[in-house]
Every structure is written in C-alpha cells, then in structure tokens.
C-alpha cells in the first residue's frame, strides 16, 4: 500500500511508474487551468527544473511530486464555457488535470512539464508557497498494487473555495480555523476521489497547519473564507491528529484521497481537515474497473447516493456561532445533464447542506454570526406569578394606559432619583436605580383583593413631551447580587426588554424596585435603524414605566400603567444641569401675571425660565421667556412671573411646558403647566340705580342704561346681581282666593348691578308671597328672574297689610352685609312680584276684579331661570297671610350656564315654557 518512492532526479532521468513516450492523453494538460494553450511539452522539457523535497519533510518523504506553476486568472471561471469542456466523454483525455494511475512496474517517465520557482523561494516558503501558487500534482504509480482506474476532478473557479476579490489564488485562511473543526463543503483544488490505494496525491500538504501566517505576502488572503467556515454533515470516524502544528502556515490541509468514498480498512490514519465533500461512514468503496477518467453511470449513482446522504446529515455538533451567511447565496444545482457526471464535477456550483441553504436564503446581505434567538433555559421567577392566557390580547407597550381603573390603582409610592448614570454595553453595571431618600423606588397596587400574585412589568420609557413609549436608546437592565431582595427575570416584548417582578398579596401588592438598572445602547445602532428619527445624544432622559395586567373572573384583563418622574441618564455631571424639584403652582388664567416659585438645584443668577408649547408630533408652536426676579432668586429657588398665553380666547385648558436653562445646553427637564380660559358670566343690559330714588316713597321711575361687555368671553370686571323691588301700590282688598294663584305667577323683580364688591352668592332674594287683597300696578317696572337655589335661600319678608292702606315697599342695600332688605314707611306692607306690567291696560281674568290691571306694551329683555319647585309649592300652599312670619333674607346663587354667549331668544322662550309648564292651573302673560 505505502510503497517507498524515489525522488525525481535532477537530470530529468527516468523514474519508475511512468511509461516512456506517453501519448498526449497521458501528458499533463494545463489548457483548462490556464487561459492559453501550451507549446509542445517536448520543447519545454529542457527548461524544466527539478524540485527537491522541502526541508520540513512531508508525511511521506518518498512520494514523487510533480509540479506545474502558472498564474491563474479569475476570469477563467467566468468565461461562460459550457460544462462539457470539463466533462464531455469525447474530450476526456486531453481535458484531464491529473492523469490516471498506470500499472505498476512500468518503466520510463512520460513527457511532462515542470515549472518551478527558484530554489531560494522553495527554501523560504516551502510547500505552502507552491500550493498557493496553484500547483498541480501527478500521482506516481504504486508499486505492488494492481492498476485501478482513477477518475479526476477539475479545479473549480476561485469563487468555489475562497471569497471574490481575494488576492491569493488559493484558499484563504479561515476566521474560524482555530475555533472549529468543521470541514469545507467545497471542492478542493487537489481532490481526486479514488478507490485504489490510500496514498494521497499531495502528501506534503498533510503537514501544513491551519494557523495564520505572520507573513504579509500574497500567500494569504486578507479576507476570510466563507467556504471553510460553513458546515457539513457528520464527521467521518477516521481519526485525525489531536494537535496542530505551530508552523507559520496559513492554510488547512486538503485531502487528496478521501473526497467522495470511505477509506478501506487499511487506510492511512493521516486525515485531511477539509475534505470536499465529506462522505458518510456508510458509503462503500467502488470496485469497478473502468479505465475511463470518469466513473460510469453505476459508479456515479453510488457517488450521488453519498452526496444525498451528506445532504440529510444533521450538523448537530456544530456550534451555532459558526453558522455564517453569504452575500450571494448559490443554490445547489439540479441533476446534471450528463448521466455519467456527478453533481460535484460541475464548476461554479456550491455544495450546501439543507441547513445552510435555509440560512442563506433568509440571511441579510452582510455576513454575520448567527446566535440562538432565545435562551435554551429562560430565567423563571422563583415564585409563581399569575400568568396571563396566551390567547389574551394585551396592549402593546406603545399604548398609553391609565394608572387607575375602577377600584384598582397602580401608584409609585417612592419616586426614583432624578439622575442615574446609565452603563454602556462595554462596561460593568452601575447598580440599580435609587430613590432620593437613599433606598429604592417603591410601587404598590391598590384595590386588588385576590390571593394570586401578579407580575409587575418594568421597562424604560421616554420622558419628553410626546406620548409615552419605550425608549429607543435605553433599556432596563437586570441587577443581581447579594443585596438584591426582589426576584426578577427578563423577557422581550415587542423588541423591548422588559423586567418582570412579582407583586404578592402577602406584601400588600407592594414591591421595592432594587433590581432594575438602566442600559445605554449604542447610538449608531439605533440611529441607523429604519424609521428612527431621534438622536441619541439629545435624548438622554427616561422614565421608569410600570405596568400590570389584572385578570378578572369574568375573563376581562385590566391593564394599568404608571410612569416615574424623568430621570437624567447622561454622563454630564449632575451639578451642571439645573433641576426643578417642586413648583408652587401648575396652572393659571391665560392672562398670566401670577408669581410662581420654583424649588430645585443648580439655579444661578443667569438662569432663565422659558415656556414652550409643542404639537403632538413635536413641532414647537410657541415660546416665551418668563420674567425672573433676580433680587429674590437663590441657588435653590427662583421667583418667576408667569407670562401671558398667546391666545386669550381659548375655550379649553391648554397644557404647555417650561424649563430652566443656565446655558446653551444646560437646561432642566421640561415641567408641565396649564393655562385655563377665563370663566364667562353672561351679562344682560343692566340698570344703574340710585339708592335715594329707591328709598324715596314717591319716585318717577327707574332710569335704565344698558351695559354690554366688550367681549362675551372676557369679563373686564365681574358683574353681580342686586335684587331690588320696584315700587308697587297696594290696592284694596276683595280679591277672591282663586286670584291668589294668579299672583303666584309673578316672579321676583331683580336688577343687574355692575359692582366689583358684591359676590353673587351673597345677593338677597325674596320669594313670591300670597296676596290677600286685590292689587293694581301703579308704575311700570322691569323684572329679571334669578335662580332660587333652595327654599332656605329663597325667603320672603312678608307683612300683612290692613284694608285700604297703601304702602311703598323699598329694598334697602346694605354694603356691610351685602344683603337686600325690604323696608317701608308704613308698619305693614305687601311685597308683590310682577313681570312686564304697565298702567293703562286691564288684564282680563276669570275671577272678577274691581280695578283693571294695566299692562305695559313694551317688553324688556329678561333672563328666566328655573326656580326650585319646592319653593313654588310652598308659596302656593302656604298658610294664610295672618299666619306668616317674618323670615330673614338669604343669599342668591347665580347659575353659570355653558355657552352663554350663544343663548338666543328661542332659548329664553324654551326656559320660560319649562318653567311654567310644571304645576297645573297656571296662566302666564
């Protein structure tokens, strides 16, 4: 099997194992490997050089090696030659790379070409340089071994065993050659499967180690190989050396004998590290005796079976990190067009296992290392957490949720510190987030009465004026250690890392967050992400967001969420940035002008307070600098005058932000502030009155001066209602009791009074009273109806009057107690409420009256407001006049209706209809 062989003689003498005068089919033909046709080999024979054995010594020092050297052009493999050039039967002879083995005992050498480098180059580099230069070797005959046909493999294009744009014509050093023992699935340049003797065609390559060479010559490619890092099927049971040589070579050893079939029992233990392809252990060696260079159809079927078995082998033992993608995945070719040629003979065809095919189809364009998507053993909490059904549709982390729902409330009992130094991925942990008191934040769920624990989710959210969502540049980090008392574990929810801790009923659903740190991601990784518009260096404030899902017995899941105060995570010192800890007010009217006191840290005499307003998409629409009282301000306190809002006619509250700024980039986190619209009170045309006229027994009437505000929504000064009584003359008695019901319809006469000192809640009001005598109206007056808040507030001051006695009731206004009192020059008086009456007109009525009632043809604007039904019934069914007692007057309340500036006459009529449509037997003018 391993017969000793002689080295070639320097003079080109004969060597055993070669036939003299070989035909052209027996010669080495380099026309396929190189781009031009060679001259007659006999003409170049005298210029050939003989190569001595390398000094390092191959594994088989007696092997006869023949070399042929010629630079190889990468375009040769891309020239578009048909596969028949490599495998057509009529051109098998001249197209072979390596001649078949000749019968043992043949004498003489066949003509051959030996183009070798200089002797100095051989001594310096040894066999490595020759292999990288594209050497082709001819196998000498084996002594004592029966002749056996040997089919050969062509050398594929350079892309078959190294990356494109590689400077070296041979396979480059693998980036994983020192990590994994996986084999290259591609065709090696010196592979020739055989079924004869086990001797290698290139034994000197067996000792080339798989380490990088320290030399910078073009021997080694500057790029790593994709082929050598790929996976193949299971390994052959043939043993291999346990250690690698320390020689400064850069290539792996290529087997020239164990390519497609298994070795016979007497095979050499020396094994290639990169057989291409690797056969399965159950493939039997071929025993056909075909003299052709390529195997027949039957032998091809065996090889095809071997390749198919390779495709079904599972690469279970290969580490997952060694799987690598390719920028240009090449599918495995279909069945060859020539039945006698196996698939691996065709050029520019990659052999890919099924696992790698799937990876290359779905891989990104760049070459990356694949890692498992999930941990094989996920971290689980030590105590059970109430699990949510998998089919439940939980809201995503981007959705804003309320912190309270029904009886449940998720509350942060202890807020975190406003500054925490986040740690980078390349450095160690900086501990958990702490509280200002020295401990850690505390979160509690209120209103939960079940006995099952729940899971509290924690993630890092944004802290700007936009809607709260997971932060793009920061993630929560799980802290472990001896001082950590809270059980926690990590999981991924929608590409966001979430930390989940238990909320247990035995702890009153209260948890101390001592296991949550903040991790800073690389800005470049996030900013280059598709759709990301934020800038990492400008987005350094975060919030701790807590979320809990509460399953109910009905199957409904209640989700609550609360967020902490903003936390500054930048590397800048905390002493440089101003920080607002408290503000004494958080809202005012649109006019501003109020003073706001800010308490915090790092305030200077040059500190400014700026109010801003932004839209939901972050666009700033308003900015105004507030006035800071520098005389009162201190390093930890600022006195600020709130600026006027840009729009004074708003109808709903507007939320804005403000911040304290010490310099160009030294600003505090934004604080919230709210501007409220001015409360609107509808004012009707009011009458200015003269108290002397009201107090006089005789008068000529009331002067009226209508007052209209400049803007219905902006009240320059509050207007108050002052109730007054128009003078009424009392007539003789004789009115029957049914007429008393008519008198109940006359409401109280009140007058709007423009005054800043009166409060609407303290205005006097007098309730309608029963009249026992027929009355007539002597003077015209106007009346305005006002709400009667309650029966207690609507009280009447009533005095019985004797027959035929007239009196002039007068309303006295007392500025001390801001109440209206009714007085008279007579001891007894009657108070009557009337509406739109004027002399000169007799009011017809069902009951007989002794004197007509005079009505006024003119109508005055009135505001009719509803009166308490209880007061009306009490006035209707009240006791006789003689039994009524004197009651002290009470204040009148004013009802502020919505959209008073849009009230029209139709609305007033509707109120009137509702007012008088309640009790029956009521007549209205």
From Swiss-Prot:
Write out the transmembrane intervals.
none
Pfam entry (one): RHD_dimer
Record PTM text: In resting cells, phosphorylated by NFATC-kinase on at least 18 sites in the 99-363 region. Upon cell stimulation, all these sites except Ser-243 are dephosphorylated by calcineurin. Dephosphorylation induces a conformational change that simultaneously exposes an NLS and masks an NES, which results in nuclear localization. Simultaneously, Ser-53 or Ser-56 is phosphorylated; which is required for full transcriptional activity. Ubiquitinated in endothelial cells by RNF213 downstream of the non-canonical Wnt signaling pathway, leading to its degradation by the proteasome.
Question: What does the UniProt entry say about where the protein is found?
Answer: Cytoplasm; Nucleus
Q: Might you report a single GO cellular component term? A: transcription regulator complex
Q: Does the keyword Transcription apply?
A: yes
Q: Which SMART domains match?
A: IPT
| Transactivation domain A (TAD-A), as annotated region | 119-199
- Which residue numbers delimit the RHD domain? 392-574
- Could you tell me which residues belong to the region Disordered? 1-95, 195-297, 839-894
Function description: Plays a role in the inducible expression of cytokine genes in T-cells, especially in the induction of the IL-2, IL-3, IL-4, TNF-alpha or GM-CSF. Promotes invasive migration through the activation of GPC6 expression and WNT5A signaling pathway. Is involved in the negative regulation of chondrogenesis. Recruited by AKAP5 to ORAI1 pore-forming subunit of CRAC channels in Ca(2+) signaling microdomains where store-operated Ca(2+) influx is coupled to calmodulin and calcineurin signaling and activation of NFAT-dependent transcriptional responses.
Entry domain remark:
The 9aaTAD motif is a transactivation domain present in a large number of yeast and animal transcription factors. Rel Similarity Domain (RSD) allows DNA-binding and cooperative interactions with AP1 factors.
Q: What is this protein called?
A: Nuclear factor of activated T-cells, cytoplasmic 2
Organism this protein belongs to: Homo sapiens (Human)
Gene name linked to the record: NFATC2
């Amino acid at each position: 099997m391993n017969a000793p062989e002689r080295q070639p003689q320097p003079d080109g003498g004969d060597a055993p194992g070669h036939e003299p005068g070989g035909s052209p089919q027996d010669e080495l033909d380099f026309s396929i490997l190189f781009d031009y046709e060679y001259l007659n080999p006999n003409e170049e024979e005298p210029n050939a050089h003989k190569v001595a054995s390398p000094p390092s010594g191959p594994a088989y020092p007696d092997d006869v090696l023949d070399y042929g050297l010629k630079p190889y052009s990468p375009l040769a493999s891309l020239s578009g030659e048909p596969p028949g050039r490599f495998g057509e039967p009529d051109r098998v002879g001249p197209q072979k790379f390596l001649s078949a083995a000749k019968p043992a005992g043949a004498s003489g050498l066949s003509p051959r070409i030996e183009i070798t480098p200089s002797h100095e180059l051989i001594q310096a580099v040894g066999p490595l340089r020759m292999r990288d230069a594209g050497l082709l070797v001819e196998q000498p005959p084996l002594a004592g071994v029966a002749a056996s046909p040997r089919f050969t493999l062509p050398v594929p294009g350079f892309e078959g065993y190294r990356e494109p744009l590689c400077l070296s014509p041979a396979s480059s050093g693998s980036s994983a050659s020192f990590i994994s023992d996986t084999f290259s699935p591609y065709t090696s340049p010196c592979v020739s499967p055989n079924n004869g003797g086990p001797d290698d065609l290139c034994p000197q390559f067996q000792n080339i180690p798989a380490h990088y060479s320290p030399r910078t010559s073009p021997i080694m490619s500057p790029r790593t190989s994709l082929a050598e890092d790929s996976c193949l099927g299971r390994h052959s049971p043939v043993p291999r050396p346990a250690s690698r040589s320390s020689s400064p070579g850069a290539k792996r050893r290529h087997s020239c004998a164990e390519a497609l079939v298994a070795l016979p029992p007497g095979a050499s233990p020396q094994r290639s590290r990169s057989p291409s392809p690797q056969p399965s252990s159950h493939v039997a060696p071929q025993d056909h005796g075909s003299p052709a260079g390529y195997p027949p159809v039957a032998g091809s079927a065996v090889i095809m079976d071997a390749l198919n078995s390779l495709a079904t082998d599972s690469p279970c033992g290969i580490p997952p990190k060694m799987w690598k993608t390719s920028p240009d995945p090449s599918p495995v070719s279909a069945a060859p067009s020539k039945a006698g040629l196996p698939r691996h003979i065709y050029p520019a065809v990659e052999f890919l296992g099924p696992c790698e095919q799937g990876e290359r189809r779905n891989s990104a364009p760049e070459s990356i290392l694949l890692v498992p998507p999930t941990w094989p053993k996920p971290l689980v909490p030590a105590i059970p957490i109430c699990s949510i059904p998998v089919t439940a549709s939980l809201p995503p982390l981007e959705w804003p949720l309320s912190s309270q729902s029904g009886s449940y409330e998720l509350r942060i009992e202890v807020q975190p510190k406003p500054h925490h130094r986040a740690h980078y991925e390349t450095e160690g942990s900086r501990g958990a987030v702490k509280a200002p008191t020295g401990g850690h934040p505390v979160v509690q769920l209120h209103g939960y009465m079940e006995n099952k624990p729940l899971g509290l989710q924690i993630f890092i959210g944004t802290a700007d004026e936009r809607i709260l969502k997971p932060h793009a540049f920061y993630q929560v980090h799980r802290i472990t250690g001896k001082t950590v008392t809270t059980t926690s574990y990590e999981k991924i929810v929608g590409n966001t890392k979430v930390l989940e801790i238990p909320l247990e009923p035995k702890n009153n659903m209260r948890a101390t967050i001592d296991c949550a740190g903040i991790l800073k991601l690389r800005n470049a990784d996030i900013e280059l992400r598709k759709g990301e518009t934020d800038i990492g260096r400008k987005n350094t404030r975060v919030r701790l967001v807590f979320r809990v899902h509460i399953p109910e017995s009905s199957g409904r899941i209640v989700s609550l969420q609360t967020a902490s105060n903003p936390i500054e995570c930048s590397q800048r010192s905390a002493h440089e940035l101003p920080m607002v800890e408290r503000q004494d007010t958080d809202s005012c009217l649109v006019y501003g002008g109020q003073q706001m006191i800010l308490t915090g840290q790092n305030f200077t005499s040059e500190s400014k307070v700026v109010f801003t307003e932004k839209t939901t998409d972050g666009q700033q629409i308003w900015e105004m600098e507030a006035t800071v009282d520098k005389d009162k301000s201190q390093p930890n306190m600022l006195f600020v005058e709130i600026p006027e809002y840009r729009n004074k006619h708003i109808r709903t509250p507007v939320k804005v932000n403000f911040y304290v700024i010490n310099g160009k980039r030294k600003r505090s986190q934004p604080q919230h502030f709210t501007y409220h619209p001015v409360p609107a009170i509808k004012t009707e045309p009011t009458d200015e009155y003269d108290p002397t006229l009201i107090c006089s027994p005789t008068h000529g009437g009331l002067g009226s001066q209508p007052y209209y505000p400049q803007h219905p929504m902006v009240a320059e000064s509050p207007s108050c209602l002052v109730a007054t009584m128009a003078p009424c003359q009392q007539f003789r008695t004789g009115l029957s009791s049914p007429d008393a019901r008519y008198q109940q319809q006359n409401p109280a006469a009140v007058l709007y009074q423009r005054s800043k000192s009166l409060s609407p809640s303290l205005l006097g009001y007098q309730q309608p009273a029963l009249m026992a005598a027929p009355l007539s109206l002597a003077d015209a007056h106007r009346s305005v109806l006002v709400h009667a808040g309650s029966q207690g507030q609507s009280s009447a001051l009533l005095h019985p009057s004797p027959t035929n006695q007239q009196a002039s009731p007068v309303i006295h206004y007392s500025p001390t107690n801001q109440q209206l009192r009714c007085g008279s020059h007579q001891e007894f008086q009657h108070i009557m409420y009337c509406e739109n009456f004027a002399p000169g007109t007799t009011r017809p009525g069902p009951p007989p009256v002794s004197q007509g009632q005079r009505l006024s043809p003119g109508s005055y604007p009135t505001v009719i407001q509803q009166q308490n039904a209880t007061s009306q019934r009490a006035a209707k069914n009240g006791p006789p006049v003689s039994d009524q007692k004197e009651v002290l007057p009470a204040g009148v309340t004013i009802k502020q209706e919505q959209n008073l500036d849009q009230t029209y006459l139709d609305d007033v009529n509707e109120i009137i209809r509702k007012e008088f449509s309640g009790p029956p037997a009521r007549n209205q003018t």
